């Protein structure tokens, strides 16, 4: 999880984001009905954010794919001299630390942990790199200049940080419809190949016809997702000759509908629901995944009941509402609309979406703003450290230490230690150069002293020889000339040595005047670096020491394009809308799930009167319990027979994180209203995640503070008054005591303590990988009740953000997992209507569609 991680747009998006991303599926026993958390007292234990890097926070950028050449000269295994760092971060230094790791165009502190799909980045990058002269024509520049002359001068103000408001260029038409549906426009997916074997094995032209029908059908749906797209309407609007093969059009339409690519969410039905229901399904939990699955199954003609332990729906999508105050306690960010199914839902529901501005000034513990140069320098080093850990993992295969998987936190500390060692090595090398130069100078001076004595002696001899009055004989004349020659040679040699002396003294002076840094990071630099680490811990909802070094950002390549947005009227509007018309039993906590070859039985209790027990019989159970509830010991829900070892092992290996929020409702705005985010730099590494980021997202004067990393768990054991007091102390340090009033309302989330969540969202723990998400998604088939009996069919299914490998920890991931399981269950019990030639009869298990 860089997200996750990245184009020029991502660079702009950088400051924004990891804040409570999307929410996961329901809760143990169902979520509540009205996803709002109405005026609750401070201390409300409400849903946490679900989603790695929810939009809006400066989410740390995720590492790029591994490269062939080592970044920063990090060519030796851990323990060696380490990355070749150049100048290091020192107090007052304005030069970025040069670890040698290439800088990327990634955005800083963005809610997107992940980068946008590469194939749609080129246009955006080229536009972002244009100068103003290149971007505007000469006429436009002249017109602009004339217009500016007529305008009155603006009032003086601090120059704002540049914000890149451009959106990545996305394909349009049928190609764009495939893109928005997360499908390749020019080839069949492996799932389509399995469902349409006659097409994939046929001629190329047949596949092209299939792809056009598929893409055009998607386009028709996306053009108007408020109304059901029927087969008849599709056939009528398909252009000739693609509408000639009605059987193929019907199969494609059925396939897209069954798998939640069209006719999903909240839309007006053209065809009424079948009066006779086929098959009974119990869904545990009314979070987004459970609600999405229920609506689909209901539209397919199945009898569906949701069991929700809370008194509202929505699960970890929970909105606090009181008067004019609105604030999301759980998921609150839409991480880009390009390819996001929430883009469709946002057209169906009144979601008031607003872009999150990425500017995010940092304030130190003393309340002073971090200088921009220092901020950028440390952030650059943070990105380089991540690059170095990627190189350690993917190129040097440094993933196991002492027979234990290496965490991202461990690797970062290793790289930092290597950099510190490198600094010491540079110091040693520097002093060696000084000593060597001094030795050379000493040796030179000794030579010069000896030479001077020789010159003195020779000069005396020359003087004496010269005093012989002429006429001198040949011997005497030769002696004078030879002494003169020797004296000239020695003087020349002395001059050369004197010149060398000057150079050595200059070199020595330069060495002594320019010592290398004696530290890799000053204490101030480390505090700012810890802020970035806290932001990364926020994006993943867990301390870095628990994240898998190799796989923490395995979902990076599936990040959606576009700006991150917040739902200003509260994210709970989505689950409330999805819940309309469904049979939901609130305050009903599931205690036991029995599944056999012949059917299932779910035993639940009333949460307000646990003596009241309910038994529900059904053909299949869809479990959308959060991973935190599945991990709970002793188990909150008993499965009979117990879940197989492969499933429980995946549950144990995967991580379920924690992230909390403090909502502060004021009577007036005392912060910069143009800024959506500002950060608070902690004074210690241990407290780096404590109230490290403040959000200003809503119309009312509300600030939302985040608590991440180790601090998220510690804070759950502290009273609301202490937490709110700490928030106010930080704000007064930044804005001044007189500027900060007492809040009118406060709410503190405690997601780990929430019995129906037990945390915020999943992460890839050390020892886990993306494969575990696939294992979590696999249904369970009970063993045959009688030896030799026909092989039973799956009865127990799983959905939720922890079951979708490519989009974990997000609301859209939860939604997609619900659509996936609804298709799987319907294929199993109603038959796959898009297959040829055999059609399964209702009620009779049909050939199973491939895993989605």
UniProtKB/Swiss-Prot annotation:
It is found in: Nucleus; Chromosome. It catalyses: N(6),N(6)-dimethyl-L-lysyl(4)-[histone H3] + 2 A + 2 H2O = L-lysyl(4)-[histone H3] + 2 formaldehyde + 2 AH2. Residues 160-172 have a biased composition (Acidic residues). InterPro entries: Amino_oxidase, FAD/NAD-bd_sf, Flavin_monoamine_oxidase, Hist_Lys-spec_deMease, Homeodomain-like_sf, SWIRM, WH-like_DNA-bd_sf. One of its GO terms (molecular function) is MRF binding. The N-terminal sequences of INSM1 and SNAI1 compete with histone H3 for the same binding site and thereby inhibit histone demethylation (in vitro). The modification N6-acetyllysine is found at residues 432-433, 436. Induction: Down-regulated during neural differentiation in neuroblastoma cancer. This is Lysine-specific histone demethylase 1A.
């Amino acid at each position: 999880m860089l997200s996750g991680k990245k184009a020029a747009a991502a660079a702009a998006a950088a400051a924004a984001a990891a804040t409570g991303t999307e929410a996961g599926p329901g809760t143990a026993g169902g979520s509540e009905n009205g996803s709002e958390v109405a005026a609750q007292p401070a201390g409300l234990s409400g849903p946490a954010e679900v989603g790695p890097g929810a939009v809006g926070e400066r989410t740390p950028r995720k590492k790029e794919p591994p490269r062939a050449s080592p970044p920063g000269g990090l060519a030796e295994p851990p323990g060696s001299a380490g990355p070749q760092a150049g100048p290091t971060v020192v107090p007052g230094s304005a030069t970025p630390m040069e670890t040698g790791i290439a800088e990327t165009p990634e955005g800083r502190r963005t809610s997107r942990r992940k980068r946008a799909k590469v194939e749609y980045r080129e246009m955006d990058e080229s536009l972002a790199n244009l100068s103003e002269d290149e971007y505007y024509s000469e006429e436009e520049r002249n017109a602009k200049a004339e217009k500016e002359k007529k305008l009155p001068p603006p009032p003086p103000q601090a120059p704002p940080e540049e914000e890149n408001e451009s959106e990545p260029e996305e394909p349009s038409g049928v190609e764009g419809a495939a893109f928005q549906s997360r499908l390749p426009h020019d080839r069949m997916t492996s799932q389509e190949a399995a469902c349409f074997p006659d097409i994939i094995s046929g001629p190329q032209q047949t596949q092209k016809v299939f792809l056009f029908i598929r893409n055009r059908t998607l386009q028709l749906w996306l053009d108007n997702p408020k109304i059901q797209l029927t087969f008849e309407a599709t056939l009528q609007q398909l252009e000739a000759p693609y509408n000639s093969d009605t059987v193929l059009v019907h199969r494609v339409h059925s396939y897209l509908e069954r798998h939640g690519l069209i006719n999903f969410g909240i839309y007006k039905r053209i065809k009424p629901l079948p009066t006779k229901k086929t098959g009974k399904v119990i869904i545990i939990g009314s979070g987004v995944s459970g609600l999405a699955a229920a609506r689909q199954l209901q539209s397919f003609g199945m009898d569906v009941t949701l069991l929700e332990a809370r008194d509202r729906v929505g699960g970890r999508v929970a909105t606090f509402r009181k008067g004019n105050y609105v604030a999301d306690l759980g998921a609150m960010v839409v991480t880009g609309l390009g390819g996001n199914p929430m883009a469709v839902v946002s057209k169906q529901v009144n979601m008031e979406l607003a872009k999150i501005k990425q500017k995010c000034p940092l304030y130190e513990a003393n309340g002073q703003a971090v200088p921009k140069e220092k901020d950028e320098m440390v952030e650059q080093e943070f990105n380089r450290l991540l690059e170095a850990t990627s190189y350690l993992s993917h190129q040097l295969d440094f993933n196991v230490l002492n027979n234990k998987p290496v965490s991202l936190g461990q690797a970062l500390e290793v790289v930092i230690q290597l950099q510190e060692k490198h600094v010491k090595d540079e110091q040693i090398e520097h002093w060696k150069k000084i000593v060597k130069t001094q030795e050379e100078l000493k040796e030179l001076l000794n030579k010069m002293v000896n030479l001077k004595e020789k010159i003195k002696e020779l000069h005396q001899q020359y003087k004496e020889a010269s005093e012989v009055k002429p006429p001198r004989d040949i011997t005497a004349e030769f002696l004078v000339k030879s002494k003169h020659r020797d004296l000239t040679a020695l003087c020349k040699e002395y001059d050369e040595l004197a010149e060398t002396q000057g150079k050595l003294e200059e070199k020595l002076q330069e060495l002594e005047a320019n010592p290398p840094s004696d530290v890799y990071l000053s204490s101030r630099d480390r505090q700012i670096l810890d802020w970035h680490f806290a932001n990364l811990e926020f994006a993943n909802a867990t301390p870095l020491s628990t994240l898998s070094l190799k796989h923490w950002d395995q979902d990076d390549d599936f990040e959606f394009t576009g700006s991150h947005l917040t739902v200003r009227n509260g994210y709970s509007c989505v689950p409330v809308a999805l819940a309309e018309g469904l049979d939901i039993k609130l305050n009903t906590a599931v205690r036991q799930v029995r599944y056999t070859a012949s059917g299932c039985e779910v035993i639940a209790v009333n949460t307000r009167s646990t003596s009241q027990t309910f038994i529900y019989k059904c053909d299949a159970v869809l479990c959308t319990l959060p991973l935190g509830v599945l991990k709970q010991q002793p188990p909150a829900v008993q499965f009979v027979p117990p879940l197989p070892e492969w499933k429980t092992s995946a549950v144990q290996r995967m991580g379920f994180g924690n992230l909390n929020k403090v909502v502060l409702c004021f009577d007036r705005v005392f912060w910069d209203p143009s800024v959506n985010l500002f950060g608070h730099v902690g004074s210690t590494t241990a407290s780096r995640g404590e109230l490290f980021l403040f959000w200003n997202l809503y119309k009312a004067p509300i600030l939302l503070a985040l608590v991440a990393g180790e601090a998220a768990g510690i804070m759950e054991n502290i009273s609301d008054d202490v937490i709110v007091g700490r928030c106010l102390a930080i704000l007064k340090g930044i804005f001044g005591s007189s500027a900060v009033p007492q809040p009118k309302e406060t709410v503190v989330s405690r997601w780990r303590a929430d019995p129906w969540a037990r945390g915020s969202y999943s992460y890839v723990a050390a020892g886990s990988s993306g494969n575990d998400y696939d294992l979590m998604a696999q249904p369970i088939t009970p063993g045959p009740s009688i030896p030799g009996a026909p092989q039973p069919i799956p009865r127990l299914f799983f959905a939720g953000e922890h079951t979708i490998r490519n989009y974990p920890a997000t609301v859209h991931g939860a939604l997609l997992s619900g659509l996936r399981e609804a298709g799987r269950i319907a294929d199993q019990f109603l038959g796959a209507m898009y297959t040829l030639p055999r059609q399964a009869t209702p009620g009779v298990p049909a050939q199973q569609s491939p895993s989605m």
